[in-house]
Amino acid sequence: TTLADADRMVVATEKNNTLLSVDHTRHWYPLWHRCREMIEDGAIGEPRSVLLVFHSSRSMLFRNGTHMVDTVLWFAGSAPTAVYALAEGGFADYGPRFASDGGHESDTDPAMSMLVELDNGARAFVNTCKTIPQVFDLEIFGTNGMVRVNEDDATVTTTNGNELLERRLPRPQFTSTNLAGCMAEMVDLINTGGNPSVDGNTARQVLEVLLASLQSQNAGNARIELPINDA
């Protein structure tokens, strides 16, 4: 998998006037959308740090890792500019290019810890591990508070002088989510027009971060500036 592969997909769909929607599924989770809207509306001030933890036997960089990186970039609302990364033990010689079996066997694709610099000055941290019981937790820290969200629960903490006020968000009512939400959006776009929640260029940005993390791991965890050259 290379950026050139992604570019060919984007060009082909644009040339043929075809919708390309990428299944980064949390874009169709109503509770996660509500949290993102609150951040956009300034509920916690300016986002300065995003922390995502995902532990699972399937914490593979090019499987669930794609969703994790998409999530932090989405919530940060900013483009990545540099990446530092450290792979799990046993992958010291992995990289600088994708070399797994396409997301099937976990021993071919590393879990990764990475720090992503963003062009608004914020930082995003993604930490994944295959040997810890399943945990999925996202925290967004802003200048006036924080949002914490997992699969089906979310809290917002804001400052009031020296006091911290925490409240749990109600779960929105919905008729479709996950992949079904993605498909419902596609049908609506075909009928009425518009742009997908996750188009090819958005997904390409995620791929670039993943590939940069492999280059960082291969270069002794060095800082890799974007855009990268993965030819």
Short names for language-model regions:
Residues 9, 35, 212-213:
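Aromatic/hydrophobic pocket-lining residues that form π-stacking "cages" and hydrophobic walls in ligand
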Residues 11-16, 37-41, 66-69, 99-101:
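Short, hinge-like loop/turn segments at secondary-structure boundaries
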Residues 104-109, 119-184, 199, 228:
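NAD(P)-dinucleotide binding in Rossmann-like oxidoreductases
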Residues 14, 40-43, 77, 191, ...:
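Residue-level signal for alpha-helix termini/capping positions
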Residues 1-27:
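Beta-strand-loop-alpha-helix segment that lines the small-molecule cofactor/substrate pocket
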Residues 165-231:
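C-terminal helical cap and adjacent loop that interface with cofactors, partners, or active-site loops
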Residues 16, 30-49:
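Rossmann-like NAD(P)H-binding beta-loop-alpha module
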Residues 48-123, 127-133, 201:
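Rossmann-like dinucleotide-binding domain that binds NAD(P)(H)
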